[in-house]
């Protein structure tokens, strides 16, 4: 079953998530359905295509209105400051990658759950109230299906 992914915050970490999904050929497992960032689709497409660290993105990237199109996959670009107002239910988002650095507690990150997402992964150290702090390869076996807001420790 394909996991529908949304990214909130399209800085270094958000862009690396996109890069990882495409460069490891995992698009049959993970479908990126939305990016929420204050930058517009054209700017974010450019940042996807050209990276000073990783070089040029090896896939076709274009813009179609408020969508970034990567290899034919349409990714909706949003610019909403309040995560509770995002259309995660409409987009059937399974997991939000919270990459802004602003919503690092369970209380704040749960706004994505309120908006309709099933789970949230915080890309920064989480507050004491997160369900778990998971470092894959170190303690990933502690992750439970009932966890809704987790931190991946740090970017």
Residue ranges of predicted features:
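N-terminal Rossmann-like NAD(P) cofactor-binding subdomain of oxidoreductases
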Residues: 1-155
């Amino acid at each position: 079953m394909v996991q529908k992914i949304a990214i909130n915050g399209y800085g270094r970490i958000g862009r690396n998530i996109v890069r990882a999904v495409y460069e490891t050929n995992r698009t049959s497992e993970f479908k990126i359905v939305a990016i929420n960032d204050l930058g517009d689709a054209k700017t974010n497409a450019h940042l996807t295509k050209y990276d000073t660290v990783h070089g040029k993105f090896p896939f076709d990237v274009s813009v179609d209105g408020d969508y970034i199109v990567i290899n034919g996959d349409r990714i909706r670009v949003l610019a909403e400051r309040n995560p509770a107002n995002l259309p995660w239910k409409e987009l059937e988002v399974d997991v939000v990658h919270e990459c802004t650095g602003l919503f690092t507690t369970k209380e704040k990150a749960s706004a994505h759950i309120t908006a309709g997402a099933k789970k949230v992964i915080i890309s920064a150290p989480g507050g004491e109230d997160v369900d778990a702090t998971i470092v894959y390869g170190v303690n990933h076996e502690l992750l439970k299906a009932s966890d809704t807001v987790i931190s991946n420790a740090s970017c």
